[in-house]
Curated annotation (Swiss-Prot):
This is PTS system alpha-glucoside-specific EIICB component. It is a multi-pass membrane protein. The phosphoenolpyruvate-dependent sugar phosphotransferase system (sugar PTS), a major carbohydrate active -transport system, catalyzes the phosphorylation of incoming sugar substrates concomitantly with their translocation across the cell membrane. This system is probably involved in transport of the alpha-glucosides trehalulose, turanose, maltulose and palatinose. Pfam families: PTS_EIIB (PF00367), PTS_EIIC (PF02378). Residues 1-416 form the PTS EIIC type-1 domain. GO terms for cellular component: plasma membrane. The active site is at residue 472. It comes from Leptotrichia buccalis (strain ATCC 14201 / DSM 1135 / JCM 12969 / NCTC 10249 / C-1013-b). InterPro entries: Glu_permease_IIB, PTrfase_EIIB_Cys, PTS_EIIC, PTS_EIIC_1, PTS_Glucose_EIICBA, PTS_IIB_1, PTS_IIBC_a_glc. It is found in: Cell membrane. Its EC number is 2.7.1.-.
Length: 529
């Protein structure tokens, strides 16, 4: 069961990654159309304003179609066969579901969803152009999960020859069409009550203050090894747990209003404390890396620096910290618990000093969605955040250095044997086993992803040992038939992996942002045999 939950959480990362770019586009557009920043050139009707208005509208695509993107994104990772067709089926059935909901509202309740949307009545929205109940991303995710189940079960269903035209995607849609009718009726009956519960939750989270921010941030970090952290931040950042439509959309919608106001950001947007978890990526990660470097053996410092610098760059710029965190998680889990506590304390401290915003990503998000737009009227808050962050960088360094030395933790560069540092070089592994001898049959002439995939495929026990293969943002998630056939972690690290999570036959290989390409190469090798 846990394996399925982890897969589901990881699948949500496919659409989430799109927000990194579009958020910057909308943030920049907001800055460049702000007359307080740009002057008269940014007044409505000017060529400059019109240009950035067009760019902004394109950037808004992902935010306005978020439920559809989440619905289409899930089958990419969850469908066990013909993922592209599963995405098409999901889009068709999710749209059908929304039409059913709108029709039921009109026929049985006398409610014109189109009029409700036009009048901006809370609880209604146009999803993909269909006026319906606003089920937010939850509706898209639940329907997508149901369609994926139907797809995996019925796509290969063999029909009599005279009904052959209805096989495959058509049959899945036929079954789904029937299933969507009771789903729509249940939604109309249950969802309004659920919306009332969400409204109550929003009020509770708003009143929870500093303690709520601490708990939220702590859980978001501490659950990373399990993959369940997606279920912590998604309802807040992309769902309605804190504000309607989620913090991500709400912040972007009001960014110009907040930037032009002279009131404190915390009074304008108190719920913004639930999106401060990115600060540990910007300020905490460098402190951790410096502590590892400072405590490494003198003859290994150069190798440790070569290992950590690209990882820190990734963490700070893009907000992807798993490659760093998994360099010490399994050899020193106590450090990860301390990391979660410090991250939560940093976020709570910043919130106490009035820092709020949309800060779940990396430095690019901080600059373009927060610091640059807000600096003119909220410079004090921005400076306070940076000062507090740098103080915590020092705290991270001191605490991690103390614990590493006090407990003699074998972090990178402190291993008892020289051999261990070589685990991060796939070249050594290939030299030992021979170029292209991995079971995937990949030669040295092929690309780096293929080489990495070949080594990982061999470490997983070969294609015969793989039952399911998918990925999230940074991890390759694999279900194997026989865990005893897996090679030691050294084999995975030889391919450049940052760590391996083993839970019975459920395996997670932490690769980094190149994981989609690596997965694709492995799948190609498995098909070729």
């Amino acid at each position: 069961m846990m394996k399925k939950v982890q897969r589901f959480g990881g699948a949500m990362m496919a659409p989430v990654l799109l927000f990194a770019f579009t958020g910057i586009v909308v943030g920049l557009s907001s800055v460049f159309t702000n007359t307080e920043v740009m002057g008269k050139i940014a007044e409505e009707g000017t060529v400059w304003y019109n240009f950035w208005y067009v760019i902004s509208e394109g950037g808004w695509t992902v935010f306005r179609q978020m439920p559809i993107l989440f619905a289409i994104g899930l089958p990419i990772s969850l469908a066990t066969k013909t993922n592209a067709r599963a995405c098409m089926e999901t889009f068709a059935l999710y749209t059908t579901f929304n039409y059913f909901v709108a029709a039921i509202l009109k026929v049985f309740y006398g409610i014109d969803a189109a009029k409700q949307v036009a009048d901006k009545v809370t609880g209604y929205s146009a999803i993909g152009g269909v006026p319906t109940l606003d089920t937010n991303l939850f509706g898209g995710i639940l329907i997508a999960a149901l369609v994926v189940y139907l797809h995996n079960k019925y796509f290969d269903k063999k029909l009599p020859d005279f009904l052959g035209v209805f096989q495959g995607s058509v049959f899945v849609y036929i079954v789904g069409f029937v299933v969507m009718i009771p789903c729509a009726f249940l939604t109309v009956l249950i969802w309004p009550k659920f919306q009332m519960g969400i409204s109550a939750l929003q009020g509770f989270m708003k009143a929870s203050g500093i303690f709520g921010v601490w708990i939220y941030t702590f859980l978001e970090r501490i659950l990373i090894p399990t993959g369940l952290h997606h279920f912590v931040y998604t309802p807040f950042v992309f769902g309605p747990a804190a504000v309607p439509d989620g913090i991500q959309v709400y912040w972007v919608q009001h960014i110009k209003e907040f930037a032009q106001s002279t009131q404190s950001l915390k009074s304008l947007f108190p719920q913004g404390g639930f999106a401060l978890h990115g600060n540990s990526k910007i300020f905490g990660a460098p402190g951790i890396a410096l502590a590892m470097y400072a405590t490494a053996k003198s003859d290994k410092k150069k190798a440790v620096a070569a290992l950590l610098i690209p990882i820190i760059f990734t963490a700070v710029i893009s907000g992807i910290t798993e490659p760093l965190e998994f360099t010490f998680l399994f050899i020193a889990p106590v450090l990860f618990a301390v990391h979660a506590c410090l991250a939560a304390t940093m976020a709570a401290t910043m919130y106490a000093f009035g820092v709020v915003g949309n800060m779940g990503g990396g430095l690019l998000d901080f600059f373009f969605l927060n610091w640059i737009p807000m600096f003119k009227n909220h410079s004090g808050t921005v400076i306070a955040q940076i000062v507090i962050g740098l103080i915590f960088t020092a705290i991270y360094f001191v605490v991690f250095r103390f614990l590493i030395l006090k407990m003699d933790l074998k972090t990178p560069g402190r291993e008892d044997e020289d051999e261990e540092m070589k685990l991060y070089s796939k070249a050594d592994y290939r030299a030992k086993h021979g170029e292209g001898d991995a079971k995937g049959g990949v030669s040295s002439a092929e690309d780096e992803y293929a080489q990495k995939g070949a080594i990982i495929l061999e470490a997983l026990g070969g294609k015969e040992n793989i039952e399911e293969l998918n990925n999230c943002a940074t991890r390759l998630r694999v279900s194997v038939k026989d865990a005893s056939k897996l090679l030691p972690d050294a084999a995975f690290k030889a391919a450049g992996a940052h760590g391996v999570v083993r839970k019975g036959t459920a395996i997670q290989v932490i690769i980094g942002l190149s994981v989609p390409q690596v997965r694709e190469r492995i799948e190609e090798m498995m098909k070729k045999g």
